């Protein structure tokens, strides 16, 4: 992650597909002296309780796990008891939990990383 941050233009935001990846990304950004969210916003998929206690608290996309479990059990019950096989796809909307790791994008969104070789300073 740190090497990637040095080699690419600094993005305005990073979306981590897993919470663990968000933790690695946050630590790499902090080690490189890149301020979250002032320079880069960070968002993660999944919303464990600990996300609210990071520095800064992490913006996340929460899956409706309880509702997903209820629907799965209902579909399994219907299949076993009623002989009704589920058809199609059912989508349950996620919820955006906005915390302090996100901000509006900075004006110079394409500015090179301040730590990249030959890059401009912030």
Task: Please place each PLM-identified region on the residue numbering.
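Flexible loop/turn connectors
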Residues: 2-111, 117
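Short, intrinsically disordered C-terminal tails of secreted or membrane-associated proteins
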Residues: 120-121
């Amino acid at each position: 992650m740190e090497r990637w941050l040095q080699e690419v233009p600094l993005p305005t935001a990073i979306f981590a597909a897993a919470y663990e990846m968000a933790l690695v990304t946050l630590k790499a950004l902090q080690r490189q002296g890149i301020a979250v969210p002032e320079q880069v916003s960070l968002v993660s998929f999944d919303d464990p309780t600990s996300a609210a206690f990071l520095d800064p608290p992490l913006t996340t996309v929460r899956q409706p796990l309880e509702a997903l479990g209820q629907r799965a059990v209902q579909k399994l019950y219907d299949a076993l008891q009623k002989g009704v096989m589920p058809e199609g796809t059912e989508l349950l909307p996620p919820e955006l939990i906005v915390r302090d790791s996100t901000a509006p994008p900075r004006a110079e969104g394409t500015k090179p990383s301040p730590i990249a070789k030959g890059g401009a300073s912030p």
